[in-house]
Amino acid sequence: MMGKPEDLKLIDENGRRIDGRKKYELRPIKMEVGVLKNADGSAYVEWGKNKILAAVYGPREIHPKHLQRPDRAILRVRYNMAPFSVEERKKPGPDRRSVEISKVIRGALEPALILEMFPRTAIDIFIEVLQADAGTRVAGITAASLALADAGIPMRDLVAACAAGKIEGEIVLDLNKEEDNYGEADVPVAIMPLKNDITLLQMDGYLTRDEFIEAVRLAIKGAKAVYQKQREALKEKYLKIAEEVGGGE
């Protein structure tokens, strides 16, 4: 959160935001499953101006062997921002923020996976941010969850994520870049909707207790809308496969 220029209005007198959205409106979201031929599972998500690719490999044998768990698979997540993903070119390779977000995403996804079915193996998730525009962690979780489902990894539920935040004293859904830079708070949330479980809850900034509750409720509502889009994307992929199989008869 940065100091806002005096002439920048994030929300107008009609409740419209800088990009024309209403307070409780998501940015446009597009999802596609099975986009990489050489991965066990993959997904591509465009969320506002974010462009994110997720690939899953595994379950596969772990090297070195001392990392193996005798009772379950281990989940490894690598979140990376491409050098060209932001306006000021980023140094290649993982930085402290990428390492931290990798851990956050792993923690959000792990409760959904039935890892005990694959002892002594690893499931690797690679999340590549091709273009960044605020909310990359929730978009990354959403893409990774789709890629896991595409890989056929047994899951208790999909994990869907969304953030709410505070701009100019108002609680709003799904912050864009300007709102994230100059707003007062950001609350990313990830859920397993069928189980009604929260797998990620963070806050950056300052909110009153009532504002925090409102932001969490709004983020959950947004995540449920994202979940429906995930289901549609998976359905679309398998309808395509069915058509291809049917067409080959």
UniProtKB/Swiss-Prot annotation:
Keywords: Cytoplasm, Exonuclease, Exosome, Hydrolase, Nuclease
UniProt keyword rRNA processing present: no
Localization (cell): Cytoplasm
Pfam (any one): RNase_PH_C
Family classification: Belongs to the RNase PH family. Rrp41 subfamily.
PANTHER family noted in UniProt: EXOSOME COMPLEX COMPONENT (PTHR11953), EXOSOME COMPLEX COMPONENT RRP41 (PTHR11953:SF0)
Name used for this protein in its record: Exosome complex component Rrp41
Organism: Thermococcus onnurineus (strain NA1)
Gene from which the chain derives: rrp41
